[in-house]
Amino acid sequence: MSNVTVSVFTLDKSISEEPVLPSSFIPSSGNVFPKFTSAIPKTAWELWYFDGISKDDRSSIVIGVTRNAEGLKHGGFKVQVFVIWADERTWHRDLFFPESVVSIDESGATEGIWKHATSSSSISFSCAGDLSKASLVFDVPGIVQGDMHLEALPGDTGLDTDATLGPSVYYVRPLGRASVKAQLSLYSSDATAAEQFILGTSANGGMDRVWSPLSWPQVMTESYYLRAQVGPYAMQIMRIFPPKGSENSENQPSTMARLYREGQLICAPQHVVTRDDALITHDSLILSKQNTSDSGDAVTGEYRDKNTGYTVEFVGKGNEEQRWEFQVRHERIIWNTPTSRPGPDATGNTGFVERLYGGTIGESYEGVGTGGQCELS
């Protein structure tokens, strides 16, 4: 067997009361192996995120695999599973496993398993060392069983660009653009037989790796996430607003956004600007909320932010002619999760199936994606 490095987390031994420094970011790498290898402080977190959506029937799947101190409340490290069928039915479970083991061999191939030995249940993932593919296996009898497969699409990866999201978060996309297949058997609490979920044809998605030594409330007050395919364009966006008094002294929003055309990276914003900014010296993102509906049947989140979508603009550095604009409209709700107490000013986290159209001047491509918006305060 080749040399293997292993990170083993157990709930009773791996949450630290003391500060723990993460291992270093590795440039031009997927950084799939954990950054907190033996213990994680109570504020820190690590996320392995996978998603896929069918452009044909809008079925979608979203998986979040985490290590953080939240497990102390629930008896395990969390894996979230969300699906939405073509007929808009949804299924969601937060599953908790007391043991998490991730290994990497000398080729860079990484395997992770979140498991419960007593119940013989687990959810696992693997990622090839060359980042050509990734897979997940779900084996939680009576709840979810099946698999999900991602295969990297040809072209640029974007891994040689800046991976910071503000001063405190690393945001890496090991498979930022991938074809996706999934087939799951899903059980509801009132059902004796499983429902089958098969991700529709022509599905695209990807895998993200995100970590920070600071908790989400220390990092942001609001966020928007998007991964979409629109004609020849693929886009990936994460944008956050920092809390007042954070390390972001100017209290400016941060982004880690990428735009590809036919597999070629054409714009890589790390800066959020407005249309009023006179001189744009870096690749930049303009992200504006929309609150209009042409048909009167607008889809919004359940909480106080009632926007119906966004206008997304990618602007090339120093060149106003390098501008790509896309309209994003919320089409379906995948999840609504509160982040505050109920009430008229309640905040929350909403996942969407997004419908998009746009391009550069003279273009009008259409496409779909998965989006998520969150308010914490």
Swiss-Prot record:
Segment forming the signal sequence: none
Enzyme Commission number(s): 5.5.1.-
Domain of life: Eukaryota
Enzyme class: isomerase
Reactions the enzyme catalyzes: (5S)-3-[(2E,6R,8E,10E,12E)-2,6-dimethyltetradeca-2,8,10,12-tetraenoyl]-5-(hydroxymethyl)pyrrolidine-2,4-dione = trichosetin
Keyword set includes Zinc: no
Pathway per the UniProt entry: Mycotoxin biosynthesis
Listed InterPro entries: DA_C
UniProt keyword terms in alphabetical order: Isomerase
Keyword Cell inner membrane: no
GO MF annotation terms: isomerase activity
Role noted for this protein: Diels-Alderase; part of the gene cluster that mediates the biosynthesis of equisetin, a trans-fused decalin-containing tetramic acid with antimicrobial activity. The PKS module of eqxS together with the enoylreductase eqxC catalyze the formation of the polyketide unit which is then conjugated to L-serine by the condensation domain of the eqxS NRPS module. Activity of the Dieckmann cyclase domain (RED) results in release of the Dieckmann product intermediate.
Family as reported in the entry's similarity comment: Belongs to the Diels-Alderase family.
Name recorded for this polypeptide: Diels-Alderase fsa2
